[in-house]
Amino acid sequence: MKKFALPVVAIALLVSGCYGVATARFYPVHGPLTQQAPAPVLVGTLTETFNSGSIKLVLENGEVCKGHWSPVPRPSRTESGTTSKGTAEDMSAVWDEIYGSGFYVARVLGSRRYAAATAVGSHGTKVYVEIYEPESEAHETDASRIRGVAKDSNGNIYKITFQNRFVI
């Protein structure tokens, strides 16, 4: 019986989409990196979709930033306000700068598929990352539907895109 447990668990994880690795591209939209021609596109990896996992990002100077991310708690019915209390940084303005005024409150805040991380670099740079997936698309396996934003301690703001499928 035990020899069948591992394949069954692996298949269940694959079918449910609860485990995977995605490559993320960080496009600078504001800050010092946008002054470079062409602006560098940073590449990172995120693991284990929206349950919790790790993030790794290599900055333009070669600095490696690593961190752990987890779901952002949904606000309780008694809480009021326009930002989540579960994040290290208030990223609502970053969402609105990239996706348009009111996007954060209308789409991201309170979403079931909303996660945040702080990645710390080997030279001390901090990168605050948030990702969100529209609930109407939450059961698909194509990572391109996920939206994300980031800002770093050097004054850069990034739009994050995912262009591949989550895989084991």
Model feature map: region roles:
Residues L14-T34:
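Bacterial Sec signal peptide processing site at the extreme N-terminus
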Residues P28, L59, T83, G121-H123, ...:
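Acidic surface patches and DE-rich sequence motifs
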Residues M1-C18:
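Sec-dependent bacterial lipoprotein signal peptides
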Residues Q35-P73:
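Post-signal-peptide N-terminal segment of Sec-exported extracytoplasmic proteins
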Residues G155-I168:
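Short, low-complexity, Pro/Ser/Thr/Gly-rich segments in the mature regions of secreted, periplasmic
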